[in-house]
Amino acid sequence: ASRLYANVRALPIVDYHCHLNEREIAENRAFPDLGELWLGGDHYKWRAMRLCGVEERYITGNADYHEKYILTRFRVRYIATTDDPVSPLNWHGVYGDTTVAPTFRPDRMLSLDADALTELAAAADTDTGSLEGFKLALIRRLDYFVAHGCRISDHGMDFLPAEDCGVRRAAELYARRDTLTADERGELFSHLLAFLADAYTARDMVMQLHFGTYRNVNTAAFSRVGRDAGYDIMRGQTDTDRLVRFLDGLDARGAMPRTVLYSLNPTCVPALATLTGAFPRARVGAAWWFNDSMAGIRRQLETVSEYALLGTSLGMLTDSRSFASYARFDFFRRILADTVGGMVARGEYAPAHADRLMQDICYGNAVDFLRLQLQLQ
């Protein structure tokens, strides 16, 4: 395990899903102190602070608490930030050895929020009053993202998609979007996601699906500090049968993009791992959020190894708003080395292939799956 880790410790990083502020990267922001660097915007840590009894004014309040060389030190070669379709994308580009690219995240638009649709119409110079106009606006913004280096989309979902209801039914639902029932919203969402999946496939993009989250469960806290502040939890068991029907519909017409699946509830991972055998363009994503602990990462690796193929894993990502989170890659590589080393020691994996397996999971698989033009240096 020690030797395997040593051989991947210095590999470059491909962070294909994060929430960093691209402007802070572009301007090479110098943080005034360690507190802001480590805690600023990172609701994972805010949650832990509350559990330890820290007063809210020290977390999201105004109480007082040098990113400069972090990306270079950790050898970060690729960062995919998470961006709203109306974002101007002014700060993405190549900075030193690091490529910073946008990710298309249309959650606000697919929620049919009136303000979001107005913003989308303005950004795309298109009337979004009809389903046809809404789709055109999404495609115009998607192409704008692709022109700025976008290779990936991302969708955070409160419920899983199912079969496509068809254009006629979707147009009727969209026309009365402000009065839809929960089931009708699910129908329309499934149609829109299928439409976008077609567009992603045509543009050779990767589609990420995040699900299993129950957001903003503390109403009083949400009213005080807003969303993404540490008041989200894990949902119970997710109905992956719906997801299977959705992916099958895409695959049947040759429109399934390369897809990464993330469930916040780890009990879904075995089902997702077997799903990748039925739909080889899909991958189980990294252990996410509450699960990227030592036990959670190890459990995810073992589950993928048992039910799918460990050698197809896309490795680690930060999914973070904090530059300090790049330490997670070393954490992951140590756990992976221990896991693979144990397999070798037990005679379950050939020693001659272990180093290649480590390098593929830590770097090569993500580069190949995302079809990035990166050279290992």
Predicted regions and their residues:
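Divalent metal-coordination and catalytic microenvironments
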Residues: H17, I79, S153, H210, ...
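Histidine-centered catalytic micro-motifs
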Residues: I13-I25, V206-R215
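N-terminal hydrophobic targeting/anchoring segments and the immediately downstream early-domain regions
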Residues: A1-V8, Y16, L20-A121
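C-terminal helical cap
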Residues: L264-T267, V284-E302, A350-L370
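Mid-to-C-terminal alpha-helical segments outside catalytic/metal-binding sites
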Residues: A1-P12, L37-A63, L310-G311, R328-Q377
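Short acidic/histidine-rich active-site segments
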Residues: R23, Q208-G212, V260-Y262, V284-A287, ...
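Active-site-proximal loop/turn and secondary-structure-junction residues that shape catalytic pockets
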Residues: P85, P106-R108, M157-F159, T213-V217, ...
